[in-house]
Design a protein with these regions (language model features):
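Acidic/polar residues at beta-strand termini and the immediately following turn/coil
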Residues: 28, 61, 126-130, 152-153, ...
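Radical SAM enzyme [4Fe-4S]-AdoMet core and its adjacent flexible, acidic
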Residues: 50, 55, 62-146
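Active-site and channel-lining beta-strand-loop segments
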Residues: 143, 147-163, 235
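Acidic, low-complexity/disordered tracts enriched in E/D and polar residues
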Residues: 188-251
Length: 296
C-alpha cells in the first residue's frame, strides 16, 4: 500500500506546523469521533479504522507520538523515526525523522545550535537534511500556530502535536532573531539540494558585504541572500523563487534589508550616487524582492 502524495504532504505539514490545504486531525488511540465531529474535508490520521464522511480522508498509522514514541508508521508504508532534538548530534538521521523539541534539554540544545550558527555559520547536518522534520519549525519562524491542525485526545482538542505543548510558547532567552535564523536554515537546506558546494548565507556567521551590520536585524520572511560558487542568489521565502543577482545589486539588497531603504544612507555606505541607488532599488522592486520585504 502506498501513501497518497497529497496525504503525505499534509502529514509533513502537520508535523512541522506548516499551512495545509485542508484541516488535518490526529486522533489519539481510544478516541472515536463521529464524521460530523470532524471538518468536512479533513485528513484524519488515526490508529484504527474510523467512519468518515464524503470529502474526508482516513490515513492509518501505527504509533502515538507520546513521550515514549520512537517511530510512527503511516499507511503500512512510510516509517518516520521520532527522536529528541538533543540526541540528533549523536545519532545519525538515516531516514525520515521527526526531531522533537518537547523537553527542556532539547530546547536548550536547539538554542545553542542557533547561537553557533549565527556566530560561525555552522549549521548541524540534522537541520540541513531533507529527510529531517523539525517539530513546529513553521510556527517558530512565523509566530503563529497552524489554524488547520488539530490533535484529538482524551483531554480534548489541541492545535499542538501530540505529547507536548508547542515549542512556540517557550522562552527564546532574548533571541528575537530566532525566526529569521529558521528562515535562513530553510534557505540553506533548499539551496544545498541544488548546489552542494560552499554556500555563504547572509546572516549565518557572515555578511556578504563589508558595510552590512553583523547582527540579525531582518524580518523573518524577507529575502535571503546567498553567495555560491556560481554567483549571488536571492531566495524569496514565501514563494520559493530563486533569483540570480549581480554582485552590486546583491550587496545593495543586503544593506536595504539590514539598514532600511534610506537612499542617502545607502549611497554613503556603497559609494553609489543617490540616483544609482534609486535605480537599483527600482529594479529590486520590479523583481518583487523589496515588495516581499515590505520595505517600499
Amino acid at each position: 500500500m502506498t501513501t497518497p502524495s497529497p496525504a503525505l504532504s499534509d502529514l509533513h505539514a502537520f508535523l512541522t506546523g506548516a499551512p495545509t490545504s485542508r484541516p488535518v486531525v490526529w486522533v489519539a488511540a481510544g478516541r472515536r469521533p463521529a464524521p460530523d465531529d470532524l471538518p468536512e474535508d479533513a485528513l484524519v490520521i488515526a490508529a484504527e479504522e474510523l467512519e468518515t464522511a464524503p470529502g474526508q480522508e482516513l490515513l492509518l498509522r501505527e504509533g502515538e507520538l507520546d513521550a515514549d514514541c520512537e517511530q510512527i508508521v503511516v499507511a503500512d508504508a512510510l516509517e518516520i523515526s521520532v527522536m529528541d532534538y538533543v540526541l540528533a548530534s549523536y545519532l545519525p538521521c538515516t531516514g525520515p525523522t521527526l526531531l522533537r523539541l518537547a523537553g527542556d534539554a532539547d530546547w536548550d540544545a536547539f538554542l545553542e545550535d542557533a547561537d553557533d550558527a549565527v556566530a560561525t555559520g555552522y549549521v548541524p547536518d540534522h537541520l540541513l537534511s531533507p529527510l529531517v522534520l523539525l517539530e513546529d519549525a513553521w510556527p517558530l519562524a512565523s509566530g503563529d500556530l497552524p489554524a488547520g491542525r488539530c490533535t484529538l485526545t482524551a483531554d480534548g482538542a489541541s492545535p499542538c502535536l501530540p505529547g507536548a505543548p508547542s515549542p512556540l510558547g517557550r522562552d527564546t532567552g532574548g533571541r528575537p532573531w530566532l525566526p529569521r535564523y529558521l528562515t535562513l536554515v530553510a534557505a540553506l537546506r533548499s539551496v544545498r539540494t541544488r548546489d552542494a558546494r560552499d554556500v555563504v548565507v547572509s546572516g549565518l556567521g557572515a555578511r556578504l558585504g563589508e558595510h552590512a551590520p553583523a547582527e540579525l536585524t531582518e524580518d523573518a520572511r524577507t529575502a535571503v541572500i546567498l553567495r555560491t560558487q556560481d554567483g549571488y542568489r536571492c531566495l524569496l521565502p514565501d514563494t520559493g523563487r530563486f533569483l540570480s543577482l549581480p554582485e552590486q545589486l546583491a550587496l545593495l539588497l543586503e544593506l536595504v534589508l539590514t539598514l532600511g531603504p534610506d537612499t542617502e544612507t545607502l549611497a554613503e555606505r556603497t559609494g553609489l550616487s543617490p540616483e544609482q541607488v534609486r535605480a537599483a532599488m527600482s529594479a529590486l522592486e520590479e523583481a518583487g524582492i523589496l515588495g516581499q520585504a515590505a520595505l517600499v
